[in-house]
Amino acid sequence: MLSLSHPHPHPASTTAAAAARHHHRRNAPFAPHHRRRRRFAHLTTSAVILGPDGRPIGGGPRDNKLPFTPPPTAPPDQLYQPFHPPPSPLPDKYKDLDLGQRLAVLRDRLGLWHEYAPLISALSREGFTPSSIEEATGISGVEQNSVVVATQVRDSLVADEGGFPAELLRYFDSYGGPELLYELRFLNARQRADAARHAIDRRLEPRGVRELARSMKDFPQRRGDDGWEAFTRDNPGDCLAFARFRQSREAIDAEDSVAELERALEVVDTEPARARVEAELDRARRKAAGEEVDDEDGAANAAAAASRPAVPVVRLMYGEVAEATTVLLLPVVREGDGGEALAHAPRRTRTDADLGMVEVDKGWTRWAVVPGWGPVAEVAGEAVVIELADGRTLPWRSAEAERVLVVANRGRREVVEDGIYVVEREGRLVVEKGRKLAAEGVGEAAAEVLVVVRPPRDEDDMISDDEWD
């Protein structure tokens, strides 16, 4: 409880002071208000803690200080747990060493590299800089970083759920082990384990491990590239082979293209990928020999066609729908809903353009509003929107990792080679080129793609020229 209290005066002056105040009140009963308020100018405020009986706790009557509060204690039925510092990252055999001994361990490289690497991290936390550690131990800053990062990669292999074999882990105990594991730092735990096994099987050097890691990291981003489907994402050899396969496409000289494909053939693992590389290698060798190579054999035109869509790809601008003269309200189907949901999506039965009313044949929960583009407005009764969570599933290279809407016409399902279509594969709706469907013998699709809509983005160039066929 808080209260206002007067400072404790000397006992001898208490009676005199009280009499003086009483005399002053009788002689000046009509003193101005501001003068009366000055009587409280000498008061001070202090905090007094009262106990259950109403008496102050702590000091005596002359003590106006806050009483000492003892530290909290746990109730009898609870266990009090004081703060404990985090465990030391140092191995047990280094915990009892003083600073000089720790520096000696690093200076003389006493033990395996992943055993003394925690000493570098501990010194950094104690205020040592890489240059001061180098001056004291002779380990350069680059090597310090390599050893510390490689230790973290090695720890992730040890903690792998699949259990990285201990006999394989010893392969990296050599002096060059940190350089190999350092290159795997950008991969996730599963990819690191696969890449480490591949590096051991092929006895790769740091440069080869770097190429392998980059190919595994880059492979998912290349979805939609020509030949990508033939390679396996979870196979390190296929990822590396696809990287070299792609480099062969970028080579200007035919001999360089053949050399890259031969290198790809050395590391490819799965049969579909091997067949794709061999077919491309045969074409490249005939081209290098001066033979005329038709576009259908493997074709430069196929690569160019794969790089751009055959339908308009539009990136919306902020406020474009609100400013449009006419808009269309279309039902939306998720890619995971399958072909049955696409077929049963509502169709427009009546439109009142004057009042802006639309009548459909059934209820629906998801709708999209798009500008009234001419090709879509002409088939608005059969139009439907397919929502794709990842635009990279689209069959062209310029697709990006973003959500997209595919506007399709259900009234036109016959497959022709020049078209783009929506088909169902394993219960999911996907977009495929008519040329590929025709080669597979597919004569009818779920719908024909009219336009692909991309979300707005904060940049001036909303629609790039290479997005159009």
UniProtKB/Swiss-Prot annotation:
Compositional bias of kind Basic residues: 20-41
Entry keywords, A to Z: Chaperone, Chloroplast, Coiled coil, Plastid, Transit peptide
Annotated region described as Disordered, given as residue ranges: 1-78
Record flagged with keyword Chaperone: yes
Sequence segments annotated as region (C-terminal beta sheet): 311-456
Entry coiled-coil feature ranges: 246-294
InterPro entries in UniProt: RAF1 (IPR037494), Raf1_C (IPR040858), Raf1_HTH (IPR040781), Raf1_N (IPR041358)
Organelle targeting peptide span: 1-46
Location in or out of the cell: Plastid, Chloroplast
One annotated Gene Ontology cellular component of this protein: chloroplast
One Pfam family this sequence matches: Raf1_HTH
Location of region: N-terminal alpha-helix: 90-281
GO biological process: ribulose bisphosphate carboxylase complex assembly
Top-level taxon: Eukaryota
Keyword set includes Chaperone: yes
Membership in a protein family: Belongs to the RAF family.
UniProt domain comment: Has 3 domains, the N-terminal alpha-helical domain, an extended flexible linker and the C-terminal beta-sheet domain. The N-terminal alpha-helical domain stabilizes RbcL dimers and RbcL dimer-dimer interactions, facilitating RbcL(8) formation. The C-terminal beta-sheet domain probably dimerizes Raf1. The 2 C-terminal beta-sheet domains are swapped and pack against each other to form the dimer interface.
Function: Required for assembly or stability of RuBisCO. Acts at a postchaperonin step to fold and/or assemble the large subunit (LS) into RuBisCO.
Protein name: Rubisco accumulation factor 1, chloroplastic
Originating gene: RAF1
